[in-house]
Amino acid sequence: IRALPWDNPAFVAPVLGLLGFIPGGAGGIVNASFTLDYVVHNTAWVPGHFHLQVASLVTLTAMGSLYWLLPNLTGKPISDAQRRLGLAVVWLWFLGMMIMAVGLHWAG
């Protein structure tokens, strides 16, 4: 695990997205259960689950894809400042989505 490129936003973004997908998938089991869905339907639980799924996995994977794609399309590697900014954006997005989703689940 230490040998993985943790300083590359193109790697970190989808990994964090997958980490957010784990509790989102557990919430999907709740939504799929008729008895539990009856309790959480039309509450803040549902948007909390949606944001864990879409905002964590899909958006972070798109961010990571762009951090890989743009340097390859332009032929210019990203600078150290851009790499650090990319890591900050990815981590802040992930933490913000986790805080928001936990709040929505708690309220639901």
From Swiss-Prot:
Name the Gene Ontology biological process terms: oxidative phosphorylation
- EC assignment: 7.1.1.9
Q: How is the cofactor bound?
A: Binds 2 heme groups. Binds a copper B center.
Q: Mainly resides where?
A: membrane
From what organism does this protein derive?
Answer: Thermus thermophilus
Residue ranges annotated as transmembrane are 10-30, 50-70, 85-105
Location of the protein in the cell? Cell membrane
Q: Which PANTHER family match?
A: CYTOCHROME C OXIDASE SUBUNIT 1, CYTOCHROME C OXIDASE SUBUNIT I
User: Under what name is this protein listed?
Assistant: Cytochrome c oxidase subunit 1
Q: Which gene encodes it?
A: cbaA
Classification from the root reads: Bacteria, Thermotogati, Deinococcota, Deinococci, Thermales
The family assignment reads: Belongs to the heme-copper respiratory oxidase family.
Q: How does it sit in the membrane?
A: Multi-pass membrane protein
Instruction: Give the metabolic or biological pathway.
Output: Energy metabolism; oxidative phosphorylation
- Keyword vocabulary terms for this entry: Cell membrane, Copper, Electron transport, Heme, Hydrogen ion transport, Ion transport, Iron, Membrane, Metal-binding, Respiratory chain, Translocase, Transmembrane, Transmembrane helix, Transport
Read off the InterPro entries from this record: Cyt_c_oxase-like_su1_dom (IPR023616), Cyt_c_oxase-like_su1_sf (IPR036927), Cyt_C_Oxase_1 (IPR000883)
For the ligand (heme a3), the binding residues are H49
Catalytic reaction equation(s): 4 Fe(II)-[cytochrome c] + O2 + 8 H(+)(in) = 4 Fe(III)-[cytochrome c] + 2 H2O + 4 H(+)(out)
GO cellular-component terms in the record?
plasma membrane
The keyword Transcription regulation belongs to this UniProt entry's keyword annotation: no
A single GO molecular function, which one? heme binding
Q: Pfam families from the entry?
A: COX1
Which coenzymes or cofactors are required?
A: heme; Cu cation
